[in-house]
Amino acid sequence: MMNDECILTTELRRTLHVNSVTFEYTLGAMGEYVDAGLLVAMGHFAHQIGLPAAFRHFVHIKQKQIRYDPIDKLLTFYVSLVDGCGYTSDIDIALKPYPALAQAWTLPTFAGQNAVNDTLHLLTWAHVEQIEAVFQFLFEQQSLACQQPRDVPLIVDVDTMGLRVSPSSRFIEWAELGYFPKTKGQKGLQFSAAFIGAGFREVLGGHLAPGYAHILNQMPALLELIEKRLDTPPRRGDLLQQRARLLQAQAREWQARAESCEASIQQRYQQLSARQARARVHQQQMDALKARAHRLPKRAKSLQTRRATHQAKLRWYRRREQASLKEIERLRQRATHCHQETAALREEAHAVLELALRPIALGQTRLILLRGDAGLGTTDTVTLLNERGYLFVLKGRDPRTAHRLATLVAPADWQCADRHLQAAEVIGQKLTGCPYALRLVLCERTDAKEHVSYYFLVSNLPVETYGTVELVKFYNGRQTIEAFNKVIGGVLFLRHLRTGNIIANYAVTQMAMLAHDFLSWSAHAFFAGTPYQGIAIRELVQKGLRVVARVTWPQPTLCRTELSANSPYAQAFVAGPRGVAGQPPLPLVFDPTPLRSKN
């Protein structure tokens, strides 16, 4: 008979004896437990607002399905962004072991890292547009900013952030040498975004560009995106018509230059034809002298001298002919360029005129106030924004202009903003190249070493609304987009380019921006009216989500999530603003007085 000590157990077990205490370790089914309990609640919130359904409705990926549906793999990656996973490899550790979390996001189970990467590499520009449709649909339904009255200006900050890669990298598309702060000889991509800060914390969208690109190259696309999300600002038809007339006048000037170049080409051809005729005469004379030298050997020497004279003149004509041909080619290129500029200006004038005459439906405009750094403070940008009806405060592009303006300000005109900064209105001066009268506010900053530097602000805000000092302080409030850059770069890890494919990286960028807005909406829905109202997204992702929870289904129509009572975030979430259990979903109503400071 077999000894009981030799019987194999059906349950794996390990023990450790320490003095009189035995520590026992076994394996058990933990499918009901998750370590990110509030991420479960976010999955339910996403289901409520239709986020998974929107992905399945708008995005169509043709990929052979073996274990996972392609959209399920895309949603798995999206959840990893919300969870703050820095790399796709984190999915296997942070998400895949928790089936209850997957079910909260309407997924049978989370896909693995390899499956997610395969789907990301299959994305095309059509899929990027489809993800943009998901973004637009959810933004229209859930945006906090869009609930503001249309006559209250929405403050939109625009900025660019560099996504650096290794200088030796050759496999990241669009990764080029460019300007990246605090580094030299760096490669990467440029990410430009439009962001609404204050109590909203919503990114309207953004674009990727090669490392050498400037934000001015992306500004037309950003303006189109802003108006798509928020509707158009009230356009200034009179300014647009004036702009169209200026463009038409410039087009006529370029057309006149093109006609002048073409006339010069005709003149050069006439001169060339005359020189060629003279060159033929000299060639004929040389041929005749050569024949006479053969017939009259005694006069060959004198004939050779005359022949050399004709040959020298022939060489001179040929040199002039080559110079004329080069001049004709240069004039032809200039004429082509003038015609191209003429066509472009006429097309732009036509578009501006159409925009000026296009009727705007009542109630479809919104006041939009743009803030931007010196990258946007060019004459063309200022003119464009003014004509399209935007309010704006921009930092001037050229510091030399600031130094020139400093000579025009009297000592009594300076107003103190703080102990290191003073400002003054520059009266009677226009921005060079801009046909409109705008406010120029000169700022003088003194650092700790008593070094003085100047910059200036350009704005169309009336001085009655924002005084000199108030305008400077208002511009300095654009630090909110700097905080956004840190969050999307270092919390949602947009800086970690997941692939070398630009299309996949573009799709990742869109989903990261959508994840940012979803976190903002979730924070408002979960914590409005609680001590954690206005919780920073960094704190929410890195601390707030990390609540141990158990998910059960006591009834087919009841899902219960038990959150750890030791977590203050769980306590605030469950208690709700009225301190009652079973708090229904909060309406997304913007409260401009948050209880907590935001990063």
Where are the model-predicted features located?
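Active-site-proximal, Lys/Arg-enriched surface segment
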Residues: 119-196, 285, 292
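A short, flexible helix-boundary coil/loop motif
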Residues: 243, 518-599
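Basic, short loop/linker segments at the boundary and entry of helix-turn-helix/winged-helix-like folds
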Residues: 32-76
